[in-house]
Design a protein with these regions (language model features):
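A general structural signal for well-ordered secondary-structure junctions
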Residues: 27-28, 74, 125
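Conserved nucleotide-sugar donor-binding catalytic segment
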Residues: 1-52
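Gram-positive cell-envelope targeting signals
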Residues: 22-25, 30-31, 45-47, 54, ...
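Amphipathic, positively biased hydrophobic alpha-helical segments used for protein targeting
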Residues: 14, 83, 147-150
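All-alpha amphipathic helical-bundle segments outside canonical DNA-binding/catalytic cores
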Residues: 74-83
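Membrane-interface aromatic/basic loop that binds lipid-linked glycans or pyrophosphate carriers
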Residues: 98-157
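Catalytic core of nucleotide-sugar-dependent glycosyltransferases
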Residues: 33-41, 47-75, 88-119
């Protein structure tokens, strides 16, 4: 783990670092206790509403999904990352970027659709597969509708 570094010039760099850490670790143990508390500064990217920053989060989460597929990680965990990816994706769609940023959002849309199709072929429960049909067709619209009915949907998913 000596050569691991947070990537330069990326927002949400901890997401990229987590991917590299996962790939370079022999074992990972989950500790279900609080080990430390942290305070988020007002100037932190965690508090930003600058949508361009979310483009890096799209890249990091897509990278994680690719890692999960490549390493045979559970489809359920991959599904969870895909669902998490829909929030920053929807923010970026609403921003209506131009040029290179617009192309990044379009690539993300194709990636989301491809991932939904792959997961539909797997062993996920029927309800999750049904949600993937909508995600595969219109990911940003699906997220906006789902977030409105989140509490009811969580009972099924």
């Amino acid at each position: 783990l000596e050569n691991l570094r947070f990537p330069d010039g990326k927002y949400f760099e901890d997401e990229f670092f987590s991917n590299y850490l996962y790939l370079n670790s022999d074992q990972i143990h989950v500790i279900p206790d609080v080990l430390c508390y942290h305070r988020v500064l007002e100037s932190s990217t965690m508090n930003t509403h600058k949508t361009e920053n979310y483009l890096d989060l799209l890249d990091a989460l897509q990278e994680r999904i690719e890692i999960y597929f490549k390493n045979g990680y559970s489809e359920d965990e991959t599904y969870k990352v895909l669902i998490f990816l829909l929030d920053p994706f929807t923010r970026c769609v609403k921003a209506k970027f131009c040029d290179a940023n617009k192309q990044r959002v379009e690539r993300s849309k194709r990636f989301i659709k491809m991932t939904a199709k792959k997961l539909m072929c797997g062993e996920l429960p029927f309800v999750k597969k049904c949600s993937l049909v909508l995600i595969g067709l219109v990911p940003d619209w699906t997220y906006r509708v789902a977030i409105r009915f989140r509490s009811q949907l969580e009972r099924f998913l």
